[in-house]
């Protein structure tokens, strides 16, 4: 018996990396998965792989900055399966770090649109469906950058992830009465393409890893297992919380 048997899950940013692993894991745990991204070719391949493994999944085009795309994605979940139980706001971007006075307003707006506005829009459109289903679980992927560790963080990225952290707590407080839980996950350095693109300077990356007590990057599987826990009924008394997965970096 899977941890998500009978559940319907919607995942953003699911075409590759952590999002794809979430889609695959959730399907393996018995969920009926709807997942979206803007990388349609890669998303279709993930969809095919899940189905080949015996899981149930459908890919949809989802630009998280477009409200109409969210309406369609939630509509796909409820139209196909009659309900929505889980939302994973996974989609996010990072841009190369520059001093604040060199960052353009357009770059800032783009990061905030994907990372923060996308979480708001997904949550906004998931809540009515979850309310009709009698409750649900929303998991927002933030970052340790949203809590601290500011020295080497890109300013727009850190601000967007901090916004997610507080938005999560407000959502949890406002919708506990609807049976909707909302929690955030805060990974530190994780071995993904996005992390490596954020730290092209290998010397800087090495120095950052030296400050992690466990002495290594995290893995996608380690983050996905935490997301699965928060999505499942095993975490039924947890809401408004932040789960840090950083090898002990913030504990120093």
Question: What kind of region is each of these model predictions?
Answer:
Residues 3-34:
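Canonical Rossmann dinucleotide-binding motif of NAD(H)/NADP(H)-dependent dehydrogenases/reductases
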Residues 94-97, 148, 228, 239-252:
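Short C-terminal tail/terminal secondary-structure segment
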Residues 98-100, 104-110, 208:
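Substrate-binding pocket helix/loop in short-chain dehydrogenase/reductase
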Residues 123, 160, 168:
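Active-site helix of classical SDR
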Residues 128, 173-174, 236:
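Alpha-helical segment proximal to the catalytic Tyr-Lys
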Residues 143:
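Residue(s) in the substrate-gating loop at a strand-loop-helix junction
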Residues 176, 181, 238-240:
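Short, small/polar-rich loop/turn modules that mediate ligand/substrate recognition or access, typified
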């Amino acid at each position: 018996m899977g941890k998500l048997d009978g559940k319907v899950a919607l995942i953003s940013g699911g075409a590759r990396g952590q999002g794809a692993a979430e889609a695959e894991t959730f399907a393996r745990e018995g969920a009926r998965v709807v997942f979206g991204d803007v990388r349609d070719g890669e998303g279709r391949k993930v969809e095919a792989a899940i189905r080949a493994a015996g899981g149930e999944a459908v890919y949809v085009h989802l630009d998280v900055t477009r409200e109409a795309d969210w309406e369609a994605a939630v509509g796909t979940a409820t139209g196909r399966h009659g309900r929505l139980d889980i939302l994973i706001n996974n989609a996010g971007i990072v841009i190369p770090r520059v001093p604040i006075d060199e960052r353009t307003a357009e770059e800032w707006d783009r990061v905030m649109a994907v990372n923060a506005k996308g979480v708001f829009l997904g949550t906004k459109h998931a809540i009515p469906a979850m309310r009709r289903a009698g409750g649900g679980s929303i998991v927002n992927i933030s970052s340790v950058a949203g809590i601290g560790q500011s020295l080497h963080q890109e300013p727009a990225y850190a601000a967007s992830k901090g916004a997610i952290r507080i938005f999560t707590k407000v959502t949890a407080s406002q919708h506990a009465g609807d049976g909707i839980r909302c929690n955030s996950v805060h990974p530190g350095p994780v071995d993904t393409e996005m992390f490596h693109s954020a730290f092209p300077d290998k010397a800087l990356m090495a120095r950052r890893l030296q400050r992690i007590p466990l002495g290594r990057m995290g893995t996608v599987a380690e983050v996905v297992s935490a997301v699965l826990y928060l999505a499942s009924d095993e975490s039924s008394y947890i809401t408004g919380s932040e789960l840090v997965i950083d090898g002990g970096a913030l504990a120093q």
